[in-house]
């Protein structure tokens, strides 16, 4: 017997959510108004010689940070290593040949 009734599936209409730019800035419950930044007292256009010195100093300070980050990443664990964590120290894992599996598979392995 073939049932050719009407399908009960009806797609739900899509709700239109306005983008965050149209809603406005989000405020924390304790914030009443966003605080405005004070205008800078120094000119933002340094002389060409000063700009180069500042850029070189910034590059020199960033390089050791990058090297430290790379060393930390190379030494950090990815989670794929087994038996090297603090929880695994001092534990001896049993060998698989010590267990005898029953034929039926319903019971627990015998040690």
From Swiss-Prot:
Question: Acidic residues: which segments have biased composition?
Answer: 29-40
Top-rank lineage group of the source organism: Eukaryota
Annotated region (Disordered) at 1-111
Cystine pairs annotated here are none
Q: Biased composition, Basic and acidic residues: where in the chain?
A: 97-111
UniProt xrefs under Pfam families: GAGE
List, alphabetically, the PANTHER family matched: P ANTIGEN FAMILY MEMBER 5-RELATED (PTHR14047), X ANTIGEN FAMILY MEMBER 3 (PTHR14047:SF4)
Q: Which family does it belong to?
A: Belongs to the GAGE family.
Protein's UniProt name: X antigen family member 3
Task: Identify the species of origin.
Answer: Homo sapiens
């Amino acid at each position: 017997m073939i049932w050719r009734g009407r399908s009960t599936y009806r797609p739900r209409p899509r709700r239109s959510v306005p983008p965050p730019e149209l809603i406005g800035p989000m405020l924390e419950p304790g914030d009443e108004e966003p605080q405005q930044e004070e205008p800078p007292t120094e000119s933002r256009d340094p002389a060409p010689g000063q700009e180069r010195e500042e850029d070189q100093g910034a590059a020199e300070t960033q390089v050791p940070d990058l090297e430290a980050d790379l060393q930390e990443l190379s030494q950090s664990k990815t989670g794929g290593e087994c038996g090297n964590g603090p929880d695994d120290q001092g534990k001896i894992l049993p060998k698989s040949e010590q267990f005898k599996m029953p034929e039926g598979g319903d019971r627990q392995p015998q040690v």
